[in-house]
Regions:
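Short, intrinsically disordered, charge-balanced linker/junction segments flanking boundaries
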Residues: 2-6, 192-195
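N-terminal binding-site loop/beta-alpha segment at the start of enzyme catalytic domains
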Residues: 5-80, 95, 108, 144-147
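Active-site mouth loops of central-metabolism enzymes
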Residues: 26-37, 85-93, 125-131
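A short, structured active-site edge motif that brings together acidic residues
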Residues: 77-90, 112-118, 181-184
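Glycine/small-residue-rich loop that forms an oxyanion/phosphate-binding "nest" at active or ligand-binding sites
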Residues: 91-139
Length: 195
């Protein structure tokens, strides 16, 4: 997995989020659908070439594997930045979902807990929209999580929010999201959002 070119790569720049934490601007994405153990060699290689930011999610069903590899890496926990995400069918139960993720990762804390998508789905039916809860209500639960799980979650944020949804959220947020993790590439250029 690691090539000499990768091993000589420079460590990516970091940015400071609103909590004061430094986050690598390049993270190792752990999405590997249908094969949780299949991500292990990639994470092992990433730890050896200097990645410090690891991104997983409840949806990926590999939080256990991510945590296992990171603990075995020998990298001090404070040198790592671990992001995981609340899945769409857990918008009604943010705290319970967070606890499951923390237990699966088996780490002392999670650096960043994101709302994976603004649209909730019916529990157990990940593709059926649930309009009984708004992303604003879900965000309020995430804000509460910062209080009830102080020290166990360092920052909260969102993922896949558009300018419209982010603007709406900011009208109601007491805590500004520390991150809006988005997909961007030549075939998906949301220039207004990236600005």
């Amino acid at each position: 997995f690691a090539t000499p070119i990768m091993a000589e790569a420079q460590i990516p720049p970091t940015t400071k989020i609103n909590t004061g934490a430094e986050v690598s601007m390049v993270g190792f994405g752990c999405f590997n659908p249908g094969n949780p153990p299949g991500i292990i060699p990639g994470i092992e290689a990433a730890t050896k070439i200097g990645y410090t930011h690891y991104d997983t999610a409840a949806l990926y069903e590999n939080e256990k594997e991510v945590g296992d590899v990171l603990r075995a890496s020998g990298i001090p926990r404070e040198k790592l930045f671990v992001t995981t995400k609340l899945f769409n069918d857990c918008h009604h139960s943010v705290e319970a979902s967070f606890d499951r993720s923390l237990e699966a990762l088996n780490l002392d804390y999670i650096d960043m807990f994101l709302m994976h998508w603004p649209q909730a789905t019916v529990p157990g039916q990940k593709y059926v929209a649930d309009d009984s809860i708004s992303f604003v209500d879900t965000w309020k639960q995430l804000e509460k999580l910062l209080e009830t799980r102080a020290g166990k979650v360092k920052a909260i944020g969102v993922s896949n929010f558009s300018v419209k949804t982010l603007t709406e959220l900011l009208k109601h947020a007491k805590v500004v999201p520390a991150m809006n993790q988005i997909e961007t590439h030549p075939y998906n250029q949301d220039r207004e959002l990236v600005k």
